[in-house]
Amino acid sequence: PIAGSMVLAAILLKLGGYGIIRMMQIMPTTKTDTFLPFLVLALWGAILANLTCLQQTDLKSLIAYSSISHMGLVVAAIIIQTPWGLSGAMALMIAHGFTSSALFCLANTTYERTHTRILILTRGFHNILPMATTWWLLTNLMNIATPPTMNFTSELLIMSTLFNWCPTTIILLGLSMLITASYSLHMFLSTQTGYPLLNNQTEPTHTREHLLMILHIVPLMMISMKPELVI
């Protein structure tokens, strides 16, 4: 059920990050080196989740693994225990909550018309549903963290935090962001470009689907313009 996936990615997954933030308040702040294995594990886990995304053929699995990679960055930022790190983690959790939920919503609109989640079978939608293609493009750009979205602000804060703590982490972060951009564009091109392989009749997009996407993207853009509401 797509509603379950949307709630899971947008809200329940963030409860783990909230729990870590609460636990860190009772931990010793000066001994970040104690948490070094967890920090390396979080960044390495983010890269492995990104690499797993690259070889997914199932659209829903791809979006689910992308959520895991973003949470790796959140955990790494929280472990550093600096104000910038916590702000970046909070911002990324909120931004990714909107983005991943929107991606699951779009995956469902595609599934309702094709009855398959295999990437190679869902191609060619830019000719059939051009407005849905616009939503796909906007959501994937948010997932890549292009400015002026909240995703960009949060990843910039996390990158600054980790770079100040240890400049070497920029290699892992850069690699993670490069792979994120790769699989996001791969997902967009696989589902929207080319010629449709399925020969069945496709329903047009409904107003409720456009409204759902507006309710995901507009609040995120408004928070991006006034980030002091959350960080």
UniProtKB/Swiss-Prot annotation:
Record-level GO BP terms: ATP synthesis coupled electron transport; electron transport coupled proton transport
Subcellular location(s) of the protein: Mitochondrion membrane
Gene Ontology CC terms, in alphabetical order: mitochondrial membrane
Membrane topology annotation: Multi-pass membrane protein
Keywords linked to the UniProt accession: Electron transport, Membrane, Mitochondrion, NAD, Respiratory chain, Translocase, Transmembrane, Transmembrane helix, Transport, Ubiquinone
GO molecular function annotations of the record: NADH dehydrogenase (ubiquinone) activity; ubiquinone binding
InterPro entries according to UniProt: NADH_UbQ_OxRdtase (IPR003918), ND/Mrp_TM (IPR001750)
Positions of transmembrane segments: 1-21, 34-54, 61-80, 84-106, 118-138, 156-178
Catalytic reactions on record: a ubiquinone + NADH + 5 H(+)(in) = a ubiquinol + NAD(+) + 4 H(+)(out)
Leading EC class: translocase
This enzyme's EC code(s): 7.1.1.2
Keyword Membrane included in the entry's annotation: yes
Role according to the record: Core subunit of the mitochondrial membrane respiratory chain NADH dehydrogenase (Complex I) that is believed to belong to the minimal assembly required for catalysis. Complex I functions in the transfer of electrons from NADH to the respiratory chain. The immediate electron acceptor for the enzyme is believed to be ubiquinone.
Membership in a protein family: Belongs to the complex I subunit 4 family.
Name of the protein described by the UniProt record: NADH-ubiquinone oxidoreductase chain 4
Organism: Trimeresurus albolabris (White-lipped pit viper)
